[in-house]
Amino acid sequence: MAKEKYERTKPHVNIGTIGHVDHGKTTLTAAISKVLHDEYPDLNPEYDFNQIDAAPEEQQRGITINIAHIEYQTAKRHYAHVDCPGHADFVKNMITGAAQMDGAILVVAATDGPMAQTREHVLLAPQVGVPKILVALNKCDMVDDEELIELVEEEVRDLLDENGFDRDCPVVHTSAYGALHDDAPDHDKWVATIKELMDDVDEYIPTPVHDLDKPFLMPIEDVFTISGRGTVVTGRVERGKLPINTNVEIVGIRPTQTTTFTSIETFHKQMDECEAGDNTGLLLRGINRTDVERGQVVAAPGSVTPHTKFEGEVYVLTKDEGGRHSPFFSNYRPQFYFRTTDVTGVITLPEGVEMVQPGDHATFTVELIQPIAMEEGLTFAVREGGHTVGSGRVTKILA
């Protein structure tokens, strides 16, 4: 059966839910898609709540691990929504997911207020390029005292302010559970709050200006085989646009390969061309599943090159921000998280600098054990033992 064609009729915006484990991010995602389905049934498919937490181990533990993409539409826009994991071990996946957001809904339970992972996500958001955050104050049906809700709201606004976000952003008092379940008390009231939240998202999160004129680049997030057709790589197009049957290079980690892609899909719909901001699958001609991996990029030929040695400008997180408790020295070997993958690298501090303390802004040289498609200005996270300990950008490519 021929697949539906993807139509670009409305502005497309990538948003997502971030926040602490069990504060209701996935429930809110389900509530948004249900409320919008009920309001605009022609525009929005019905999603099963359990589909969002897709992997079996997640349902056993009740924790969202990988990233779930769903799509929905308001009257004004088409959205791709990423439900980001909230569990501390999975911040790595949050980084890959959050790098795909034009704005985020921070979900905070009114019963708890901001918790450790709320803080970590807000801290990471600017590093992974999330420009705007608004707030869903969830579980308001479980708090009788209006003053307590106001206190939590104030605390959330302070947290946003401390991390460079707008403290006067929209904050919606809601209950995702109440809006999702028809038999919940005050169901209609909570549905109205979800509509209010989406009106705020429409207004507050700006339509992104995608870099269509720059050379095409898509970081590879996943690779799989479609039997009889070939290898598909998926990811979000970072910049540029690409018509079908165009030559591309696969750059990074391994020697650069040239190939052509013969099909483009987004949300299971066929496209003739993909462009910046699209979540896309590309079918590559003559490439085996084992020839490509997450962490490489698909790029316009000659537009980006692989490098292992660079100078970086880095902010080192303090202990309170979840970073290291002690300084590090030359020959420190953490992981450097570029786009969608971790690569180990060796740090060399500049002459005259003996060590770098938590809380410092530092410049140092890094030599990676594998080449990464790199340009000046590329951002990265520094990670150790599963925790983010710093964030930085490439200031100068050395080799």
Swiss-Prot record:
Annotated region (G5) at: 175-177
Q: Give the EC number.
A: 3.6.5.3
Please give the residue ranges the record annotates as the region G2: 62-66
Molecular function (GO) terms listed?
Answer: GTP binding; GTPase activity; translation elongation factor activity
The subcellular location is: Cytoplasm
- Please give an example of a GO cellular component term from this record: cytosol
The UniProt annotation puts the region (G4) at 138-141
Q: Where does Mg(2+) bind?
A: 26
**So what does this thing catalyse?**
GTP + H2O = GDP + phosphate + H(+)
InterPro entries per the UniProt record, alphabetical: EF-Tu_GTP-bd (IPR041709), EF-Tu_GTPase (IPR050055), EFTu-like_2 (IPR004161), EFTU_2 (IPR033720), G_TR_CS (IPR031157), P-loop_NTPase (IPR027417), Small_GTP-bd (IPR005225), T_Tr_GTP-bd_dom (IPR000795)
Q: Which UniProt keywords apply?
A: Cytoplasm, Elongation factor, GTP-binding, Hydrolase, Magnesium, Metal-binding, Nucleotide-binding, Protein biosynthesis
Q: What Pfam families is this protein classified in? A: GTP_EFTU, GTP_EFTU_D2, GTP_EFTU_D3
- Binding of GTP: at which residues? 19-26, 83-87, 138-141
Q: What class of enzyme is it?
A: hydrolase
Q: Does the keyword DNA-binding apply?
A: no
Q: Does the UniProt entry include the keyword Magnesium? A: yes
tr-type G domain residues: 10-209
Stretch list, region G3: 83-86
Name the protein family. Belongs to the TRAFAC class translation factor GTPase superfamily. Classic translation factor GTPase family. EF-Tu/EF-1A subfamily.
Function, please? Answer: GTP hydrolase that promotes the GTP-dependent binding of aminoacyl-tRNA to the A-site of ribosomes during protein biosynthesis.
Quaternary structure annotation from Swiss-Prot or TrEMBL: Monomer.
- This chain belongs to the protein called Elongation factor Tu
Please tell me the species this chain comes from.
Bifidobacterium animalis subsp. lactis (strain AD011)
Tell me the gene name.
tuf
